């Protein structure tokens, strides 16, 4: 479990993103969390030289649908990378496990099948507070990382 703020980066060691096109697929579920992660990702891409018109964002209903959204992006757009953004919070049932396992394996499968990398930015936390802490709270914004 991440317990330090890793949301700081050194732009001098990151390639300039000026000539790259990025896709972002973001889950609408827990949108207070996912929108903060998306904001962090977009601000970081812009800070690293990407232009706003080269950042394409799509929304899907939940984290489980991130795989579908990423696959559609891969098949319809020419992109250099895709960021999958979601948030799953542990509840009282096994639903958490099924969603987390499904989206993780789905993103792995897409990374193996396609040559465009998909970055996994899905918070899988035990509580809403942990998600808040990692989407702009005391542990930074994992969308930046």
Please place each PLM-identified region on the residue numbering:
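Short, ordered loop/turn segments at secondary-structure junctions
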Residues: 29, 87-88, 123-127
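Solvent-exposed alpha-helices and their adjacent loops that cap or buttress functional pockets
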Residues: 13-18, 76, 110-114
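Structural motif
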Residues: 23, 56, 65, 80-82, ...
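Glycine-rich phosphate-binding loop
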Residues: 65-107
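C-terminal binding/interaction regions
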Residues: 96-97, 101-145
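Glycine-rich phosphate/diphosphate-binding loop of Rossmann-like nucleotide-binding domains
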Residues: 12-60
């Amino acid at each position: 479990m991440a317990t330090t703020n890793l949301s700081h980066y050194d732009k001098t060691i990151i390639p300039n993103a000026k000539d790259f096109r990025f896709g972002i697929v973001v889950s609408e579920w827990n949108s207070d969390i996912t929108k903060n992660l998306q904001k962090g990702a977009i601000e970081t891409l812009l800070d690293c030289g990407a232009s706003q018109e080269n950042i394409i964002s799509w929304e899907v209903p939940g984290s489980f649908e991130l795989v579908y959204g990423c696959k559609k992006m891969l098949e319809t757009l020419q992109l250099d990378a895709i960021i999958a953004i979601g948030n799953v919070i542990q509840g009282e049932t096994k639903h958490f496990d099924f969603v987390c396992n499904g989206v993780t394996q789905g993103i792995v499968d897409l990374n193996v099948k396609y040559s465009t990398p998909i970055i996994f930015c899905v918070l899988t936390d035990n509580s809403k507070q942990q998600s808040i802490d990692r989407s702009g709270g005391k542990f930074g914004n994992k969308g930046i990382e």
